[in-house]
């Protein structure tokens, strides 16, 4: 178990300082996001010490102390170091969560929930009248999330392939692994006005001896369903561990998406076409029944 060198009151101050730094790094002025990061106890979602944090050059190193105050850093903590799965950068997630424009009462599906830390942040943001569906394919991570989120009545943990969820209309969908294409439910089960944030990414060709297969090219995108189609916008660079299950891709998709990233121009994308014939020459990337294009919806 983590140890505590600080009193509960002191730890509350440390959490507030951590949340303030996270929000500032993310360049978000949304006070609800900062409050959520100040409220949720991150240590509940990191597993038992000794914790490991990511090195800048790759791999992980163990922390020499098990003091829970060390959880309140803007660093990556390993969840499954052999697979390259980590707790994520708080400031990156704060930035992406700000793009979701979450409202009290929203129904949100969190795809790739891991041990549930960002599901708990979402739980704070939607409030008691909203609901978070935390979907995680790995049974060990899902079991940890189930335990860590048990005190949150507005969260349901689902051990399933995220490519099959949600199974009903959602106000927002938040994806936490790199994909080369959106899963059908992520597009078709967004309600009008619904928002999707996902990391588009191409798997690295080489897989490190320790750690999972991360994206070699990556970009976070915001998709919003309007009356006449799907608006799309580039948020920024984002490199996540790549999808397994129903969203694994073949060599042809890897080659085509890699070529698009190398050409550049994703920052000019304005729309996502879904099961619609794209205009040749007006798209950054054309996939199977979907495309990212330069024209407004």
Predicted feature descriptions by range:
Residues 2-109, 118-120, 125, 141-143, ...:
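Class I SAM-dependent transferase core
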Residues 88-217, 224-226:
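Conserved nucleotide-cofactor-binding alpha/beta core module
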Residues 2-15, 188, 203-297:
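SAM/dcSAM-binding transferase cores
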Residues 58-59, 132-134, 255-258:
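Short, intrinsically disordered/low-complexity patches at protein termini
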Residues 35, 79, 133, 164-165, ...:
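A broad, structure-centric signal for solvent-exposed, well-ordered loop/edge residues
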Residues 58, 171-173, 270-272:
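Short, charged low-complexity linear motifs
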Residues 51-52, 111, 201, 250:
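Residue-level detector of alpha-helical recognition elements and their boundaries
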Residues 41, 89, 138, 161, ...:
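Poly-acidic low-complexity segments
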């Amino acid at each position: 178990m983590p140890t505590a060198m600080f009193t509960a009151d002191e730890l509350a101050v440390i959490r507030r300082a951590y949340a303030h730094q996270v929000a500032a790094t993310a360049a978000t002025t949304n006070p609800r996001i900062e409050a959520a990061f100040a409220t949720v106890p991150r240590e509940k979602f990191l597993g038992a010490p000794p914790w490991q944090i990511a090195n800048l050059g790759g791999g992980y190193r163990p922390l020499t102390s098990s003091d829970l105050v060390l959880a309140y850093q803007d660093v990556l903590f390993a969840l499954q170091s052999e697979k390259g799965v980590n707790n994520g950068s708080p400031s990156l997630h704060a930035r992406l969560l700000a793009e979701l424009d979450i409202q009290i009462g929203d129904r949100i599906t969190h795809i790739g929930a891991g041990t549930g830390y960002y599901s708990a942040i979402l739980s704070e943001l939607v409030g008691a009248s909203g609901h978070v569906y935390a979907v995680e394919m790995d049974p060990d991570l899902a079991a940890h999330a189930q335990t860590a989120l048990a005190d949150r009545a507005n969260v349901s943990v689902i051990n399933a392939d995220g490519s099959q969820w949600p199974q009903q209309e959602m106000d927002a969908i938040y994806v936490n692994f790199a994909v080369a294409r959106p899963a059908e439910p992520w597009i078709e089960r967004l309600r009008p006005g619904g928002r999707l944030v996902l990391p588009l990414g191409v798997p690295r060709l080489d897989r490190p001896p320790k750690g999972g297969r991360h994206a070699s090219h990556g970009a976070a995108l915001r998709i919003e369903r309007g009356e006449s189609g799907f608006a799309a916008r580039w948020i920024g660079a984002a490199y996540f561990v790549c999808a397994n299950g129903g969203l694994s891709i073949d060599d042809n998709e890897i080659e085509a998406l890699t070529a698009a990233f190398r050409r550049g121009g994703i920052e000019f994308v304005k729309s996502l076409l879904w099961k619609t014939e794209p205009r040749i020459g007006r798209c950054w990337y054309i996939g199977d029944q979907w495309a990212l294009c330069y024209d407004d919806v």
